[in-house]
């Protein structure tokens, strides 16, 4: 009773604590120290999520408690966090926090948004798979994933997106991201020579089976110009907007790519995010709620597009935008190709509003040329 009160648990968390009392006590003994106080918060939220009821998770947590860390993993954790707590305790703290706060994973000051997104997605949607990744990276110094049936070893991949080993990360990311980054880059290299954007093939293989195999992009890869914008928008509405998809909620989180802009609506770069859900906010405005791994979700993207993190129906860790504004910054999304694919009958007014936000921001310099020629006149 005292423990559940100290953790501030609801009836859900208390029931989970009662069912897995021995495991929880072992996690506290191994991972909670004055230097790892955040583990308490992570543990409380893990119990509130009820994920220990998933059959593989509790055995995987016992494995984590007894995991023998490699010398490389111990050195990385000690270098980043010091010697006040053991590397094992630091990693347990990191696991508890990532499983308790899956939308709190950050990429730090590193170009590793794809890897951060994958860790968040696994913690959110497939926690035992995340624990398997942690085991491989921390114990074996190697992760092997498959791309179109062929194995890719993180040890055999040449290099990743990040030029240097990132250090400003949580304990799990510190150990796992270097491996994921190299594998992600290798998957991209295996797409060289294919026509189109490599994310079409990489994202479903890298993130998980639930990532839609259907793929839509509104930028011509060869020229960088906008292409088929109307179809792109109508298909996105048909796939994600409750008013156009039969009021079907999003079942699994989906990877997507956005064109990030600054407060003057100028293009900064491409960025990986996760679409979590679409729903009406308290003011009856349809919004997209998403996860942004860049540690700064509440950003001003210019032209009145201001990302919200609270006050508009966001759950903890979510960012959100009105559906139209989000669509205007979107350049890649996935969908299930087996779903009915009729384009949404979006009104011309709404379509023009989305295109207006697009053309006034990152699309301003990407408008396709019209190739108009002057009439030579009569001869």
Question: Where are these predicted regions, by residue range?
Answer:
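Long amphipathic alpha-helical scaffold segments
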Residues: 4, 11-105, 111
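Active-site signature of cysteine proteases
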Residues: 17-21, 218-379
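Generic low-polarity alpha-helical segments
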Residues: 23, 39-40, 58-64, 185, ...
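A residue-identity detector for tryptophan
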Residues: 62, 72, 122, 136, ...
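Hydrophobic, Leu/Ile/Phe/Ala-enriched alpha-helical segments that form helix-helix packing faces
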Residues: 65, 69, 117, 121-122, ...
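Glycine- and small hydrophobic-enriched segments that form the cores of compact globular domains
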Residues: 75-186
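Papain-like cysteine protease catalytic cores
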Residues: 136-246, 250
